[in-house]
Every structure is written in structure tokens, then in C-alpha cells.
Regions:
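Class I (Rossmann-like) S-adenosyl-L-methionine-dependent methyltransferase catalytic domain
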Residues: 1-69, 73, 84-133, 151-158, ...
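A short SAM/SAH-binding and catalytic strip from SAM-dependent methyltransferases
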Residues: 141-155
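A short acidic, Gly/Pro-enriched loop at the edge of an enzyme's catalytic core
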Residues: 133-142
Length: 241
């Protein structure tokens, strides 16, 4: 993973210490640059352009969503950070509507191409900090997977808080991140730390803890909160409005 990060770190703003001039918080600039080509977009979504890997990981995420928050045929579902439509492709056939949200117009273009055969999908470009374009109480499920690692902690909470506004009463939320408390998460943390500060790209992944996710869900006013660690890697937070 970090071999890839080191190799392509200069794509955003040039080589050397110029990388540090683009802050992590400039999500739109960062992710628009990273998704200039569809191949690049897929690489940053999953680490490679392999379509079989893309489909397999989407299937795994679908199982995780089904077992945690449940997916119903009558659900209106929204994804925060939909990327190239990896998960949307397996969700759209089994829900009423699927809305893909992303900070990058390029990502949304590729996602629309991937999901072009479905009439129940739409796409929304975000600022990178909230869900303002989405109507209040318009969704039954809001989820975000493999996205929080790229966000600062304040913006993780922003999305969790605004997702509650977007959800209907009884609506379900799912979020995840790599957990610092796991073996995989600690190695991930150490590999990131080993990159010299001046060379750390703004999209570098950062971890969470179960306590962090639980605090966010509680502070945002959710109920039926469940936080778990799975596969010695991921922390998952689920809750109900």
C-alpha cells in the first residue's frame, strides 16, 4: 500500500517538499487530482485497478452492511464517499434508491458510468465537510466505508452529525475505519509514521479507535449504538436515529 503512496505522492502538487503545501483538509483538490483518470481513481479506492478485486471487496462490504444495519428493498440509501461506485453497484439492485455522494466530480463521473444500467441511482457532489445538498429526513440508510481514514477527525464527526439530519426517524447509520487497537491497525499506523513528515501526502490514511467512533455517535444523538472490531483490522460503528 505505502509503496504505491510513495511512488505517486507527487501527483497532487509536485515533487519533494511541495507535497506538504496541500493540506489534508483540501479534500476536493486532493481527490479530484487523484482521480484524473479512471485507473488512478480505482487505484486510490482499493490499491489496484483489478476489477475482480473491486467486485470481491464490494461483495464483502455488502455482507457487512446486511449483517449490521440491514438492507431492505424499500430503503433509500446514501453513500458518503462513493468513489467509482464500487459498493453502489451491488446495492442498487436490492434497494429502492441509491445516492452516491463524493467530493470529486471525476469519481462521480466514473461511478455514473459503472451504474449506468440502473434507473434508481443519483449522484451528489459534496464540499468534503458535510451533506448540505441532501434533503433532511430523506434517507433510510447512510453508510461510509473506507473513507474515514482519509478525513480529519473533525470532518468524521461532521459527517456523522449531518447524517443524522439526513436520516428519517429510525434510519440506520454505518461507518468504519482501520482500528488502532488491532494488529493490522498498529502496523498501518507505524508504516505511516515511518514516512518523513515532509513527504506524507495529504491523502495518507489515518486510524480510529472504537472509543472515538462511540463518542461521535453518542454526541451526535444516535441511539442503539453498536461499535465493534472485526477481522483484527476494522472498527465499525452502527446506530439508529
Amino acid at each position: 500500500m505505502y509503496g504505491i503512496i510513495r511512488k505517486i505522492a507527487g501527483k497532487i502538487c509536485g515533487a519533494g517538499d511541495k507535497q506538504a503545501q496541500v493540506g489534508r483538509q483540501f479534500y476536493k483538490q486532493v481527490w479530484t487530482s487523484l482521480s484524473a483518470t479512471e485507473g488512478g481513481a480505482k487505484t486510490y479506492v482499493q490499491g489496484s485497478e483489478d476489477e475482480a478485486l473491486l467486485a470481491r471487496s464490494a461483495g464483502n462490504d455488502l455482507k457487512r452492511l446486511q449483517s449490521s444495519v440491514g438492507i431492505k428493498k424499500t430503503d433509500d440509501i446514501l453513500e458518503i464517499g462513493c468513489g467509482v461506485g464500487r459498493v453502489g453497484k451491488v446495492l442498487a439492485p436490492i434497494c429502492r434508491t441509491w445516492t452516491g455522494c463524493d467530493v470529486s466530480a471525476n469519481m462521480l463521473k466514473y461511478a455514473a458510468r459503472r451504474l449506468r444500467d440502473f434507473s434508481n441511482v443519483r449522484f451528489v457532489e459534496l464540499s468534503g465537510y458535510d451533506l448540505k445538498p441532501v434533503a433532511s429526513e430523506s434517507m433510510d440508510v447512510v453508510y461510509s466505508t473506507v473513507v474515514f481514514m482519509h478525513l480529519s477527525e473533525w470532518d468524521r464527526y461532521n459527517y456523522i452529525e449531518d447524517a443524522r439530519r439526513v436520516l428519517r426517524p429510525g434510519g440506520r447509520l454505518y461507518v468504519d475505519n482501520i482500528s488502532l487497537t488491532t494488529g493490522y491497525g498498529w502496523n498501518f499506523f507505524q508504516e505511516s509514521r515511518a514516512i518523513p513528515p515532509s513527504e506524507r501526502p495529504p491523502y495518507i490514511g489515518s486510524v480510529s479507535t472504537p472509543q472515538e467512533i462511540e463518542v461521535y455517535l453518542n454526541r451526535a444523538g444516535y441511539k442503539d449504538i453498536k461499535v465493534s472490531v472485526v477481522d483484527d483490522a476494522w472498527v465499525i460503528g452502527c446506530a439508529v436515529k
